[in-house]
Amino acid sequence: MNMNPRHNIREIRAPRGPELSAKSWMTEAPLRMLMNNLDPDVAENPHELVVYGGIGRAARTWEDFDRITAALKTLSEEETLLVQSGKPVGVFRTHKDAPRVLIANSNLVPHWATWDHFNELDKKGLAMYGQMTAGSWIYIGTQGIVQGTYETFVEAGRQHYDGNLKGKWILTGGLGGMGGAQPLAAVMAGACCLAVECDETRIDFRLRTRYVDAKARTLDEALAMIDMWTKAGEAKSVGLLGNAAEIFPELVRRMKAGGPRPDIVTDQTSAHDPRNGYLPVGWTVEEARAKRESDPKSVEIAARASMRAQVEAMVAFWDAGIPTLDYGNNIRQVAKDEGLENAFAFPGFVPAYIRPLFCRGIGPFRWAALSGDPEDIYKTDAKVKELLPDNKHLHNWLDMAKERISFQGLPARICWVGLGDRQKLGLAFNEMVRNGELSAPIVIGRDHLDSGSVASPNRETEAMKDGSDAVSDWPLLNALLNTASGATWVSLHHGGGVGMGFSQHAGMVICADGSEDANRRLERVLWNDPATGVMRHADAGYEIAVDCAKEKGLRLPGILGN
């Protein structure tokens, strides 16, 4: 008999097609997206309810998963389900325009917001780590981070290499749910990529889904591939089986001895969770898995020391004049806590490359076809091009995405668009559902990593102009406004991306079912959501955001005086 409430060998896949298993599309949508998060083609470890990002789960236990799905199937259009850290705790009477689901995951009072306290609660069955889109049921597989990574690499190429990454190579670590986007994003940006990953099954998964081109078992083998591709001007990627905390320092040693040097260095190991996400040097994956059960503290101590070694190497690359960036997994903070004083010598990716986009409310807009039909996504791709004819960069992205990105679970698309354009696209998609161009409704959401929905001083809000990095009123206001505006489900999480104590963030998803009611909700939600990002950055003193707010006619009395 299985006594672990978080383990089950069931295979979960979202229903496809126009038939409902809930009372309306407003409850069918969260039901399908929750199930899609645990699709074996989507989730990193679905049998343990883990979607991505270390232990980012979709539900607290399998019993909770069953209770959530049962509640969603019976929920009326005037009721709202409350989910507390992956557990369905209440159904309350609300109204038709209210969210059908409100979710709060992993939130702790600040003084107690530590991994030690969270792990204690988690062990007792009182909490669940929701990451960002795992516990908010809008994870779309590795595609969800591809364009953001692509935009980052393109901007790095523009700043450091005259906009041309041909013949250049990027060194990184981690091929999990988020990190797995890096090799494909690098190739799309015109560069080669060497990605170090300690778990061979993850490399094989990325090979199968065409996110990485080749696998190597030794550093020499991987470097030979990189050398061949860069000399030929080809953009290709290799996943190297190894530990980043060993490979990065070894590459520094070789570089100092006149060996190969990468052109850009970053990392997306699951360093945000030292206990569950990072493999210590000298340990096997199996050994770490066993020790996490028998002696979790020893894993954490060893992992932290290894992270310091990796960051020391990254600082050495930076000191050698190589563009080096933290990709938001809090690895610099851990290294600093371990005594590495100059751990923050190199910048995070948001202040270095992404913030000007956030100032205009531009961020990771995404949608999924509840029909399960890829043609619905291809039709929406065409609609995006039609409605945004002058955005050639976006057109290029959509063309590459169609050619290179394999759908995982329900077909989905991500594209970075901003204030005004999100609303325009959402209304157009709703019209396509209404007139039968699409075979079923779609859901529209985003990552919590967005312009106005997150406070994370070591990632999205690092080095804010006015010093407001740690002010977390903004994601709270974002969640409240999306609730008031009529999003289909709204989530408020803590600790995503960078780990306990380092972030608070909000998510929203809205269903376009073709109705007039949906039209009104889409109009409000898809304007207000990115507008909070423009507001937040305008308040911090960014001129781009101030200009955008004025151009779009935002009323910001305490900021613009209107």
Curated annotation (Swiss-Prot):
Compartment(s) of residence: Cytoplasm
Superkingdom of the source species: Bacteria
Residues annotated to bind NAD(+): 53-54, 131, 177-179, 197, 202, 243-244, 268-272, 278-279, 327, 497
GO molecular function: urocanate hydratase activity
Reaction catalysis annotation: 4-imidazolone-5-propanoate = trans-urocanate + H2O
UniProt entry tagged with the keyword NAD: yes
Textual note on the cofactor: Binds 1 NAD(+) per subunit.
UniProt keyword annotations, A-Z: Cytoplasm, Histidine metabolism, Lyase, NAD
Record's keyword annotation contains Lipoprotein: no
GO biological-process terms attached to the record: L-histidine catabolic process to glutamate and formamide; L-histidine catabolic process to glutamate and formate
InterPro entries per the UniProt record, alphabetical: Urocanase, Urocanase-like, Urocanase_C, Urocanase_central_sf, Urocanase_CS, Urocanase_N, Urocanase_Rossmann-like, Urocanase_sf
EC number: 4.2.1.49
Cofactor(s) recorded in Swiss-Prot or TrEMBL: NAD(+)
Protein name: Urocanate hydratase
Organism: Chelativorans sp. (strain BNC1)
Gene label: hutU
